[in-house]
From Swiss-Prot:
Lineage of the species this protein comes from: Eukaryota, Viridiplantae, Streptophyta, Embryophyta, Tracheophyta
Protein's recorded name: Unknown protein 21
Organism the protein comes from: Pseudotsuga menziesii
Length: 14
């Protein structure tokens, strides 16, 4: 279970 708001981060694509 992921409890971090890192699912829709535009910094993950960069």
């Amino acid at each position: 279970m992921i409890r971090e708001p890192r699912i829709r981060e535009p910094r993950s694509l960069a």
